[in-house]
Amino acid sequence: MTDLLVKNCLLSKNKDPQDILIKEGVIKDIASKITSDNLPTIDADFHFVTPPFVDSHFHMDATLSYGLPRVNKSGTLLEGIKLWGELKPNLTADAIKERALKFCKWAVARGTLAIRSHVDVSGQNLVGVEALLDVRETMKDFIDIQLVAFPQDGLLRANCLDNLNTALDMGIDVVG
């Protein structure tokens, strides 16, 4: 875990600059003039420090797929769902993982600490589940990822309930 001292931070609740002491990845103290000899130190140079962002509803299995298989010309949800149905049979775990990792790195670099992502479990296979479980493991030191089994085509479709249960057995967190 990370030990760090961040000096000269502007916070929303304090008029004067504050220092932030982080031990084992957890904020242990916020005060003016914290001293520590052996910690890596960052000077925030009187910039504003905010809590991290949380993305509470995302579809990481579809991230960065603009134009695949074609552009959603109407911009509507219905056309987007239709396009997803066209793309889904051609998805691979590697392609989903590559795009999701790229997105996660982008999100972390911009201050996101947690993502709740839906993953479609209504296809013939669970490539999205497989890929996003890998992504969650790969990124666990940088971002918290909660995975939601999402039966896009409905629970009553063939094999969907079985897929849902299998996804939960594989490590998906919740259903939604």
What does each model-identified segment do?
Residues 5, 16, 108-111, 171:
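Short loop/turn motifs at secondary-structure junctions
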Residues 95-106, 156-166:
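Short, acidic/polar
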